[in-house]
């Protein structure tokens, strides 16, 4: 039991779970918008998720602490460095448009992590900007990058899909903001408008997400049911999010599992 707990802890802290969620989002995008198998892009999304989240979580800590690091952290750092080298090679060989998307994502990640002028604060301190920037990064990597990679023509359906992806990720971030309300920066949404209003905001955004179905064209009816189920599951977890969680299993594992559940549903039940 102790070994299992340590393994789960490493799985979460090394960002494997959130990277898997990002990859699942990318898989959903490719499966929905293209009839060809372009899944070669998925490993890049997975590695990018690991590197980006470990960068955000651990680089500020490393810069502030000169003490020796734990064996677990050393493994995470070394793995992230190795994957960074691979991603650098991928970046140099990527087409120009893909480089532009990746560059924008990198800039947003840096602005989110480090102070930016003239505010001398990171994006975390600006109200709501943290949530918007993370949702935008997810949308860029999990949807817009696959769209460019597969050369999908832009139309109303694609624009609606992009908007939906942004809205869904935005709401998925809110449980993290709620649980981090005491330790988070001044830009935290629940800290500004309250936990109850944050949950109401999330519900309203999910309503907008559902309304956008009117502009969508899915490969089959299973996609509608999958989307509606994910909306319902997201709403339930949002409203059940406690202001304080001892182990943070709710946000770290359950909420990040929603894209994975979504991807598995599509993998097994869609044509």
Task: Give residue ranges: language-model regions.
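C-terminal ends of transmembrane helices
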Residues: 5, 53-65, 111-124, 130, ...
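Small-residue-rich segments of transmembrane alpha-helices in multi-pass membrane proteins
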Residues: 19-26, 72-85, 127-145, 192-204, ...
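Helix-coil boundary and interhelical linker segments in multi-pass alpha-helical membrane proteins
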Residues: 21-44, 87-100, 140-163, 212-225, ...
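Central hydrophobic cores of alpha-helical transmembrane segments in multi-pass inner-membrane proteins
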Residues: 23-26, 45-59, 85-86, 106-114, ...
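Hydrophobic core segments of alpha-helical transmembrane domains in multi-pass membrane proteins
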Residues: 41-50, 99-109, 161-166, 225-234
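Extended hydrophobic alpha-helices typical of membrane-associated regions
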Residues: 68-72, 228-271
């Amino acid at each position: 039991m102790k070994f299992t707990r340590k393994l789960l802890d490493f799985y979460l802290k090394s960002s494997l779970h959130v990277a898997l969620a990002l990859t699942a989002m990318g898989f959903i995008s490719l499966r929905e918008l293209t009839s060809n198998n372009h899944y070669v892009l998925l490993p890049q999304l997975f590695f990018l998720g690991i590197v980006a989240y470990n960068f955000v979580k651990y680089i500020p800590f490393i810069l502030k602490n000169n003490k020796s690091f734990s064996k677990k952290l050393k493994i995470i750092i070394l793995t992230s460095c190795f994957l960074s080298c691979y991603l650098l090679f991928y970046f140099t060989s990527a087409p120009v448009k893909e480089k532009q998307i990746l560059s924008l994502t990198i800039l947003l990640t840096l602005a989110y992590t480090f102070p930016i002028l003239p505010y001398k604060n990171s994006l975390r301190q600006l109200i709501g900007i943290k949530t918007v920037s993370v949702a935008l990064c997810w949308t860029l990597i999990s949807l817009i990058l696959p769209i460019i990679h597969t050369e999908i023509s832009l139309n109303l359906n694609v624009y609606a899909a992009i908007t939906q992806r942004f809205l869904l990720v935005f709401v998925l971030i809110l449980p993290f903001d709620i649980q981090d309300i005491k330790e988070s920066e001044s830009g935290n949404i629940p800290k500004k408008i309250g936990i109850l209003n944050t949950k109401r905001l999330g519900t309203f955004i999910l309503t907008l997400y559902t309304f956008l179905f009117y502009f969508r064209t899915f490969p089959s009816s299973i996609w509608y049911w999958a989307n509606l189920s994910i909306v319902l599951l997201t709403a339930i977890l949002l409203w059940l999010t406690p202001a304080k969680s001892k182990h943070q299993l709710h946000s770290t594992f359950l909420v990040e599992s929603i894209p994975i559940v979504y991807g598995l549903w599509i993998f097994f039940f869609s044509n």
